[in-house]
Amino acid sequence: MTNWNYQLTHFVTSAPDIRHLPADTGIEVAFAGRSNAGKSSALNTLTNQKNLARTSKTPGRTQLINLFEVAEGKRLVDLPGYGYAQVPEEMKIKWQRALGEYLEKRLCLKGLVVLMDIRHPLKDLDQQMIEWAVESDIQVLVLLTKADKLASGARKAQVNMVREAVLAFNGDVQVEPFSSLKKSGVDKLRQKLDSWFNEIPPQEAVEDAE
């Protein structure tokens, strides 16, 4: 199995919606989460780059789909943060529609990383994202971010509680604690990404079968 070098990840493009994304080929893994879940920090920690994904002091700032290339045909996709209170309702609905459309229609999407603050996991929209992914046969890795904010016992209890809760989705959903500050959980994230990126892209599998 190839171990991809995530430090070589670089920005490719931003798109306002799925129609403006590059060709639906290769393999993509998407990162999704509430606006303050620490998504940008996780991407920066994964790639060991301070400014790959710009961390914003204003949650809800990332309104575009941002694509980063790990290697040729292997992309990380930073989806718009969702659920921020100060964003107009109309815009929230537009984002949710775009997220749902992406998860349902993007053939090269192999995995979804859902980031949640370990202190406030499984909000409605988090569950909606997991549900959409499971319905589309997409594997999910839940990262419980800011794990350093809890003492060891409380952290374990939260992880176990979420692991128990996601069984209800009847899908392939893995749950791991993560801390950008302490760089804990990064190895688990890399292992999961490696396994997704080592799969045969959907369009190549179809060609091989013909």
Curated annotation (Swiss-Prot):
Keyword terms, alphabetized: Cell cycle, Cell division, GTP-binding, Magnesium, Metal-binding, Nucleotide-binding, Septation
InterPro entries attached to this UniProt entry: G_ENGB_dom, GTP-bd, GTP-bd_ribosome_bio_YsxC, P-loop_NTPase
Cofactor(s) demanded: Mg(2+)
Domain (EngB-type G): residue spans on this chain: 25-199
GO process annotations (BP): division septum assembly
Residues at which GTP binds: 33-40, 60-64, 78-81, 145-148, 178-180
A GO cellular component annotation in the UniProt record: cytosol
GO molecular function (one): GTP binding
Pfam families: MMR_HSR1 (PF01926)
Binding site for Mg(2+): S40, T62
Family: Belongs to the TRAFAC class TrmE-Era-EngA-EngB-Septin-like GTPase superfamily. EngB GTPase family.
Role summary: Necessary for normal cell division and for the maintenance of normal septation.
HAMAP family per UniProt: GTPase_EngB
Protein name: Probable GTP-binding protein EngB
Organism: Klebsiella pneumoniae subsp. pneumoniae (strain ATCC 700721 / MGH 78578)
